[in-house]
Swiss-Prot record:
The gene is LCB2a. GO terms for molecular function: pyridoxal phosphate binding; serine C-palmitoyltransferase activity. Belongs to the class-II pyridoxal-phosphate-dependent aminotransferase family. This is Long chain base biosynthesis protein 2a. Serine palmitoyltransferase (SPT). The heterodimer formed with LCB1 constitutes the catalytic core. Involved in the regulation of the programmed cell death (PCD) signaling pathway. Plays an important role during male gametogenesis and embryogenesis. Its EC number is 2.3.1.50. Ubiquitous. Detected in leaves, roots, stems, flowers and at a lower level in mature seeds. It is a single-pass membrane protein. It comes from Arabidopsis thaliana. Heterodimer with LCB1. Component of the serine palmitoyltransferase (SPT) complex, composed of LCB1 and LCB2 (LCB2a or LCB2b). Signal peptide: none annotated. The modification N6-(pyridoxal phosphate)lysine is found at K311. It is an enzyme of class 2 (transferase). It comes from the Eukaryota. The lcb2a-1 mutant is incapable of initiating programmed cell death (PCD) after induction by fumonisin B1 (FB1), a specific inhibitor of ceramide synthase.
């Protein structure tokens, strides 16, 4: 739970109030212009309504240049950011031919597989030559190749479940699978900060949805107990099925799930555990096998294991791992498997090769080195940010580090100044976060050198001073005692 300092909350509310007031004033004068110039869309219902339309026009457009920045190179430790300009107050942004070489603190390239790799890339190129860029078919038609079969076997072995099925899109893995697993008469109990794909999948299922306080097992147990006692709405019949949905690492918080407690509670109340490991698989654990390995949880106690290949593996798509009966059922029922084009074969080969590197099956210890480096880099960077006085969310070992900004004016200030000093960061505000909880989300990679991280820390510290986001006092710097100093008894 984030506790906002009182003065920070007041100043943030004041900033939003000021933006709202000026926006309303501009809209007032805009009515006269709209009246004078007739529109070709008279009689059409507006696409955006009310406050959503107002927010986009009067708040988001002001800082639109801080989002969706195009890049023109691989998402390595350093990449090329395309420069843009606007002639209409950020309503439209146009690309230039100029690029800026920036330190990449925004990509999910946790293990550094997002760029050229001496083991993965040649095999991906060979796969492209043999199978082409797309299968042009769904898995149940002509879209299953030998590479897809090998990938599912590889994932099964890596995550420690009896079977697995892969999909071409990580987001769709959640949003398409959950409605197949549960429907009307079922109960989904979801963490309050679960990803949008989980939220949309739960809403589309038709099941009753209840939310428990973020990463709070005691509240989860209370909700479970109450819902089991009450039963289904109106009829009070027992629930047909109960699924508890949590994430391994919460992408906007950088926090690691209290999985052992969640599993124990679900066992007690006979509820299924659905674990989303989008950000944790491959990135944490001694051998990269995710939160179960990190926290010592038996994978047999997690009923449905979901993950994506877009982060640690440098590819695309997602997977579901579980019992053989579950996977067979999903292959016959899930629309994402039946109707969507299968994951591109070169992308599947990239995942297989990355897993082999992580497991050391490439004949080297590069996988172990990458895992040690991402852990070392993450803990070093987090500790240094906290020493500087930033409010940093998340837990140790997590490569995701949100730095709290709060005030809406500090979103563009932090983003633009960092970019000006050749450090590319991701900033996040409403509606992706609550209104008062804007933040910058730092993602650390194994491809970052210690020199890269020190340079980034210097820039972020300087920008933090300029924008006033060091909400805690910095630790005093330790002065090393010179050998020539005279010690007085």
């Amino acid at each position: 739970m984030i506790t906002i300092p009182y003065l920070t909350a007041v100043s943030t509310y004041f900033s939003y109030g000021l933006l709202f007031a000026f926006g309303q004033l501009r809209d007032f004068f805009r009515r006269f212009i709209d009246w004078w110039f007739t529109s070709n869309l008279q009689g059409y219902a507006p696409i955006c309504l009310g406050h959503e339309d107002f927010y986009i026009r009067r708040l988001y457009h002001r800082i639109q240049d801080c989002f969706e920045r195009p890049i023109s190179s691989a998402p390595d430790a350093w990449f090329d950011v395309v420069e843009r300009y606007s002639n209409d107050n950020n309503k439209t942004l146009k690309r230039t031919t100029k690029t800026s070489r920036c330190l990449n603190l925004g990509s999910y390239n946790y293990l550094g597989f997002g760029s050229f790799d001496e083991y993965c890339t040649p095999r991906v190129i060979e796969s492209l030559k043999k199978f082409s860029a797309s299968t042009c078919s769904s898995r149940v038609d002509a879209g299953t190749t030998s590479v897809h079969a090998e990938l599912e076997e590889c994932v099964t072995r890596f995550v420690g479940k009896p079977a697995a099925v892969v999909f071409g899109m990580g987001y769709a893995t959640n949003s398409a699978i959950i409605p197949v697993l549960i429907g009307k008469g079922g109960l989904i109990i979801s963490d309050s900060l679960n990803h949008s794909s989980i939220v949309n999948g739960a809403r589309g299922s038709g099941a009753t949805i209840r939310v428990f306080q973020h990463n709070t097992p005691s509240h989860l147990e209370r909700v479970l107990r109450e819902q089991i006692a009450e039963g289904q709405p109106r009829t009070h019949r027992p629930w047909k099925k109960i699924i508890v949905v949590v994430e391994g690492i919460y992408s906007m918080e950088g926090e690691i799930c209290h999985l052992p407690e969640v599993v124990a509670i679900c066992k007690k109340y006979k509820a299924y555990v659905y674990l989303d490991e989008a950000h944790s698989i491959g990135a944490i654990g001694k051998t990269g096998k995710g939160i179960c390995e990190l926290l010592g949880v038996d994978t047999a106690d997690v009923d449905v294991m979901m993950g994506t290949f877009t982060k640690s593996f440098g590819s695309c798509g997602g997977y579901i791992a579980g019992s053989k009966e579950l996977i067979q059922y999903l292959k016959h029922q899930c629309p994402a498997h039946l109707y969507a084009t299968s994951i591109p074969t070169p992308s599947a080969q990239q995942i297989i090769s990355a897993i082999k590197v992580i497991l050391g099956e490439d004949g080297s210890n590069r996988g172990a080195q990458k895992l040690a480096r991402i852990r070392e880099n993450s803990n070093f960077f987090r500790a240094e940010l906290q020493k500087m006085g930033f409010e940093v969310l998340g837990d140790n070992d997590s490569p995701v580090m949100p730095i709290m900004l709060y005030n809406p004016a500090k979103i563009p200030a932090f983003s633009r100044e960092c970019l000006r000093q050749k450090v590319a960061v991701v900033v996040v505000g409403f509606p992706a976060t609550p209104l008062l909880l804007a933040r910058a989300r730092i993602c650390i990679s194994a491809s970052h050198s210690r020199e890269d991280l020190i340079r980034a820390l210097k820039v972020i510290s300087k920008v933090g001073d300029l924008s006033g986001i060091k909400y805690f006092p910095a630790e005093p710097k330790k002065i090393e005692q010179s050998k020539n100093d005279i010690k007085l008894d």
